[in-house]
């Protein structure tokens, strides 16, 4: 695998690990004892069930969330890749000095 692909793969896997850790933390923070009304639909998007009739359909909301997540991951991967490139350059400069 070429060096750049390894770098992107490493950055991607690091970002995915961080993203999974954040999700696990959010899930553990949101764990609450069940109430008497277990049939109530969760409002993860912050929308009340009655607000779905205001022109926002569930597939549109899901698509928007997926797009937002994709953009977020792309920006994090880019930042991580740039960071790793800078680290590699610093290491190379350190080894090239007499």
From Swiss-Prot:
Q: Where is this region: Disordered?
A: 1-63
Specify the protein name: Uncharacterized protein 089L
Query: Whose protein is this, by species?
Result: Invertebrate iridescent virus 3 (IIV-3)
Give the Acidic residues compositional bias ranges.
14-29
Q: Where is the composition biased (Polar residues)?
A: 48-57
């Amino acid at each position: 695998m070429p060096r750049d692909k390894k770098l992107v793969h490493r950055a991607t896997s690091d970002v995915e690990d961080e993203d999974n850790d954040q999700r696990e933390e959010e899930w553990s923070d949101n764990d609450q004892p069940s109430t008497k009304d277990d049939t109530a639909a969760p409002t993860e998007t912050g929308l009340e069930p009655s607000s779905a009739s205001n022109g926002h359909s569930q597939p549109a909301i899901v698509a928007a969330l997926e797009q937002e997540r994709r953009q977020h991951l792309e920006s994090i991967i880019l930042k991580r890749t740039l960071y790793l490139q800078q680290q590699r350059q610093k290491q190379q400069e350190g080894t090239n000095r007499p």
